[in-house]
Regions:
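N-terminal secretory/targeting leader peptides
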Residues: 21-29, 41, 50-148, 166-361
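Positively charged n-region of N-terminal signal peptides that target proteins for export
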Residues: 1-9
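Intrinsically disordered, low-complexity segments used as extracellular stalks/linkers
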Residues: 35, 40-48
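C-terminal motif of bacterial Sec signal peptides marking the signal peptidase cleavage site
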Residues: 16-19
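A gly/proline- and charged-residue-enriched helix-loop-helix capping module
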Residues: 149-163
Length: 361
């Protein structure tokens, strides 16, 4: 089946040549785990929403899957979504939130979402772009200056296009949550373009991300997310990139104590529902879902920036060196990565044009 094969490709993509002439080796390890870029961490327990509703016999009980931990901002927002749906439906709809990859890694529960055995799921761009390739455009370096720009785009026609574009894969997008701005963490201090030359940098097994590192002069390395710490210890890689929350929670600062706050990619997660379930809902219930998701997104935006600020301060307290690049350095990064834009502008030109139009560029 075409749609399910597309999902499988997310786990087994083999990358070719990059825009800057480097090459990649497909990650043959286990699929990316909760620690993946896409900004999640492993946790321990399941947060159940609407449990009282189940006791009194809710008409519907949905499974919601995420690989994020219970105390991660995204999970807190998803629990709020579940609570809001339960309240707004007067207990007719209960949602069980299965966090910390209890239902499998993202690739696994994305397939379950398509099959209808999972009803709602949080999907990161690293996983989703293996299925819905157009979403890879959001991984372009420096596409957004900050998350304010990102939200401006997602709240308009572009966001609607992305959510509805998933229909071809038996999925309906229902909203977005913040996934932060990514920074480089390294074993030696990096504060200029020259410092990247020949440096082995771990990135997700994603063609665009590999191209980005190659353009900086580094060597992209693809290892499983749960092996990054040991890869840094053994010298397989000399750095990686993620948001400060993950750098802290995965203790990566212990073996790569230099954090370059370049914010080269600002990303989101997409909250998705099985398309058959969505189509089966009444207009009233669709409105309940939309309103609950809007409330959850607002809550996510409220707590995300504070969580990042707290993580940065904790990294400093634990001895990490936070490097703040100046404008000239950031300009040199943008110039070096121009070939990435050239390649992907041709590939995803229409969506990129819509993003730039929304930003007034």
């Amino acid at each position: 089946m075409k749609k399910m094969l597309a999902a499988a490709l997310a786990a087994s993509m083999v990358m070719g040549l990059t825009a800057c002439g480097g090459s990649q080796t497909a990650d043959t390890k286990a699929p990316e785990s909760a620690k993946e870029a896409d900004s999640t961490v492993a946790g321990e327990s399941t947060e159940t929403a609407g449990s009282d509703a189940q006791k009194t016999g809710s008409e519907m009980t949905w499974k919601l899957a995420t690989d994020a931990a219970k105390d991660y901002p995204t999970t807190k927002a998803l629990v709020k979504f579940a609570d809001e749906v339960y309240e707004k439906s007067n207990g007719r709809i209960a949602i069980d939130v299965y966090e910390s990859s209890i239902l499998g890694d993202e690739v696994s529960y994305m397939e379950q979402l398509q099959a209808g055995t999972v009803d709602v799921a949080k999907l990161s761009l690293g996983t989703l772009s293996g299925l819905y390739e157009d979403t890879q455009v959001f991984l372009l370096p420096f596409l957004f200056k900050n998350n304010t720009e990102m939200w401006k785009v997602l709240e308009g026609e572009v966001g609607t296009t992305v959510k509805n574009g998933l229909n071809d894969y038996s999925i309906q997008g229902i909203g977005f949550t913040d996934n932060g701005s990514r920074c480089f963490y390294t074993t030696t201090e990096v504060d200029s373009l020259d410092d990247f030359k020949g440096l082995a940098i771990r990135v997700q097994n994603n063609q665009l991300m590999n191209s980005m590192v190659s353009c900086l002069g580094g060597n992209p390395v693809n290892v499983s997310a749960n092996e990054v710490y040991s890869a840094l210890q053994t010298g397989v890689c000399k750095g990686g990139e993620n948001n400060p929350n993950i750098i802290l929670s995965d203790s990566l600062y212990e073996v790569a104590p230099y954090v370059l706050m370049d914010n080269h990619v600002t990303t989101m997660d997409v909250i998705c529902m099985n398309l058959d379930l969505w189509d089966s809902l009444s207009d009233e219930d669709k409105e309940i879902v939309n309103e609950a998701m809007a409330d959850a997104t607002a809550y996510d935006r409220e707590i995300w920036d504070d969580s990042v600020a707290e993580s940065i301060q904790t990294l400093k307290d634990k001895g990490a060196t936070i490097v703040e690049p100046d404008d000239a350095t950031l300009d040199s990064f943008r110039e070096a990565m121009a070939p990435v834009y050239e390649e992907y502008s041709a590939k995803y030109g229409d969506l990129l044009d819509a993003i730039n139009e929304a930003l007034g560029k």
